[in-house]
Amino acid sequence: MAKKSKQLRAALEKIDSTKAYSVEEAVALAKETNFAKFDATVEVAYNLNIDVKKADQQIRGAMVLPNGTGKTSRVLVFARGAKAEEAKAAGADFVGEDDLVAKINDGWLDFDVVIATPDMMALVGRLGRVLGPRNLMPNPKTGTVTMDVAKAVEESKGGKITYRADRAGNVQAIIGKVSFEADKLVENFKAFNDTIQKAKPATAKGTYVTNLTITTTQGVGIKVDVNSL
């Protein structure tokens, strides 16, 4: 514990808490100040000036990072017949119907993404209390309720991330791993930022991005200059 505190203090000394950094500077600092003994995840956290109580200001979606996330996602697909075969051929880790529902209801959760064809949603709906709180429930807005299961599986395996603004307008997302080259992390960030900027509601007033930080697992949040975006 003492060693960790010492590492945290050392990291804090390298970061000026009164300064807002460029994206390139923030990424470099995130890599430099990371003290986790594993390949830590690099994340971004936005605070958006939106009112999610208004239907037209809810932000939710998905995108594929150009350089992936550095994480191999375990993909589960609810499908039958030809669509089930397509999912398997595309690399889905688990494909099924009632058998998977029973398994999940028994406590099994060894998967990261859930995809379903539209006709399976009545069945998948039974798992709402389990999947919903874990943000695993398939949704058309994130491309996880679809007839094109092969594409959905391939994207999920190839760096697809989902995002959603919470009640306070906060949006968090993974942009890669500490082991990534800095320019790859910057490229991923810029791709995600473009997505967030394009998602700005037409009715949102004032400054859209009010705060933005980049951090690593167990790391220190590094403030990014929103005016540089």
Curated annotation (Swiss-Prot):
GO terms for biological process: regulation of translation; translation. Binds directly to 23S rRNA. The L1 stalk is quite mobile in the ribosome, and is involved in E site tRNA release. Belongs to the universal ribosomal protein uL1 family. InterPro entries: Ribosom_uL1_bac-type, Ribosomal_uL1, Ribosomal_uL1-like, Ribosomal_uL1/biogenesis, Ribosomal_uL1_3-a/b-sand, Ribosomal_uL1_CS. Pfam families: Ribosomal_L1. Keywords: Repressor, Ribonucleoprotein, Ribosomal protein, RNA-binding, rRNA-binding, Translation regulation, tRNA-binding. Part of the 50S ribosomal subunit. GO terms for molecular function: rRNA binding; structural constituent of ribosome; tRNA binding. This is Large ribosomal subunit protein uL1. GO terms for cellular component: large ribosomal subunit.
